[in-house]
Every structure is written in structure tokens, then in C-alpha cells.
């Protein structure tokens, strides 16, 4: 929200955020409880940003809507990668749809976004993503 309303932006090489991996971090655990917490956290952020979209001035709304769309794409991606389940993906899509977050907006944010949006808009596309994305992640 700060960057959306900023009148001047200064660039710097300083790191504003840096993540240190450690054993106690929720992002390093793959148990069901940790995954559920991560997904709940993402949904909470999406809900809060969606709430803000309706309350910020129109000039700020476009940037915030883009962020919501990109986070929604990332959420769907994480469900595909971590859950690897058609049932979980369908539940995710249905939940996002009920909140007005799906289908993803028809915007040209990036090539990755455009293709992901097109693929997630069809059952066949979602099945292809579900069967290929987890394999691509392993190769990297």
C-alpha cells in the first residue's frame, strides 16, 4: 500500500527483506499442518488485498488489482505444486471463483501470466498444468 501511494521512489541496492532458512521455519516443513497454514496465510493476504481494492482511490486500484491477480496466480501455482491433486485444484478454483478472484483478469501483465490464465480457464489446461508443473519444478 505504501508503494502504491508513494509520490517518489528511490532505488537502492539495500535488501529490504532477506529470508534465512532455518529448521523452525514454516516454509521448510512439508507436513500437512504447515502446508495448511501456508495456504491459509496466502488466502488471508488475498482476502485483505481484495478488501482494500474496494476502498482505495481509483488511481491506486489498478496497481492493487494487478497485485491481487498475480498473487492469485501464485496461489493456484502453489496448490498445483504442493497438493498435486485434481480435487484440491478444483476446490481452490471454486473458492477463488466464489470470492471473485477467478477467472483471472484478462490482462497482459506478463507472458507467464497470459499463458497461465489461459491454461487455468479450461479443465484440460488445468489438467495439463497439474501433470507438468510438478515435473518442471524438480528439474530446476
Question: Language-model segments: which ranges?
Answer:
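Nucleotide-sugar-dependent glycosyltransferase catalytic core
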Residues: 8-44
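Acidic donor-binding loop at a coil-to-helix junction in glycosyltransferase catalytic cores
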Residues: 1
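Secondary-structure edge/capping motif, primarily at the C-terminal ends of alpha-helices
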Residues: 30, 52-56, 78-83
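Short, well-ordered alpha-helices that flank and scaffold nucleotide-derived cofactor binding pockets
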Residues: 4
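C-terminal, non-catalytic tails of nucleotide-sugar-dependent glycosyltransferases
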Residues: 41-63, 101-106
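Amphipathic alpha-helical repeat scaffolds of TPR domains
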Residues: 66-78
Amino acid at each position: 500500500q505504501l508503494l502504491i501511494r508513494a509520490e517518489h521512489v528511490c532505488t537502492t541496492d539495500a535488501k529490504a527483506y532477506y529470508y534465512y532458512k532455518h529448521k523452525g521455519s514454516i516454509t521448510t516443513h512439508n507436513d500437512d499442518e504447515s502446508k495448511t497454514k501456508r495456504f491459509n496465510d496466502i488466502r488471508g493476504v488475498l482476502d485483505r488485498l481484495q478488501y482494500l481494492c474496494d476502498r482505495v482511490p481509483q488511481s491506486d486500484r489498478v496497481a492493487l488489482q494487478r497485485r491481487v491477480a498475480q498473487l492469485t496466480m501464485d496461489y493456484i501455482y502453489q496448490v498445483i505444486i504442493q497438493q498435486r491433486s485434481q480435487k484440491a485444484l478444483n476446490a481452490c478454483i471454486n473458492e477463488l471463483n466464489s470470492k471473485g478472484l477467478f477467472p483471472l483478469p484478462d490482462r497482459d501483465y506478463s507472458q507467464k501470466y497470459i499463458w497461465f490464465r489461459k491454461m487455468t480457464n479450461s479443465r484440460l489446461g488445468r489438467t495439463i498444468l497439474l501433470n507438468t508443473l510438478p515435473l518442471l519444478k524438480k528439474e530446476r
